[in-house]
Amino acid sequence: MGFQTIINNASDITIDRRKAASTVITRSGHLRTAERLPSVYLFNVNVADGLTYSTNRSLIEELDRLDRTIEEEINIGTSNTGLAYITQYQGNLTPAQINQITVTSATGGNIVLNTTSVSGSPTGDIFKKGDYIQLDTNYRYPYTVTADVTFSGSSVTVPINRGFISQTGYTVSGKGIEVGSDVTWRVKALQNPTYSIIPYDRISFSGAFQLVEVIT
């Protein structure tokens, strides 16, 4: 793990998932906005001067191998549970109940879920606004939920923060879901800082790691 180790040891993480948009004012005074789809996740990660060089030489080698050309799968909160509060699931279902949900369809800004097999007659919200959701079985792209979603015993429609991204060779119908800290991103480095060895036996990075989600 290269980028994942950086995430796990971050002193701060900036998550930028704003839409890429341009705005112009026409000669008639009308404001027009064009949005580029899909929007992507950008992570700016700083690491304090605390990692020990002698026990992290393999990390340095892995970061040099990845550089800005090779992608890595990362999570926030699974590898380092101390970060789980960032992505933690907020809804009312148990992990076992989440595992009983399957996907019916996913198009545009919605994911439709089949909840008929969910046991225990749960009540309340299946998702809270801001929850993370991702299809399972190696689907690449996570989403956030844009409104509270109340549980229904048959089907629920989950509004998501960006248009659903098709993945070559991936069948949506019948898949399960991942939520909370179980979601992952595939990223490459836009900026991979150099490092210095400082007394005693510590690594100092020259700046932030800037990681961008890879859309294939």
Predicted regions and their residues:
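Extracellular/virion structural assembly segments
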Residues: 1-216
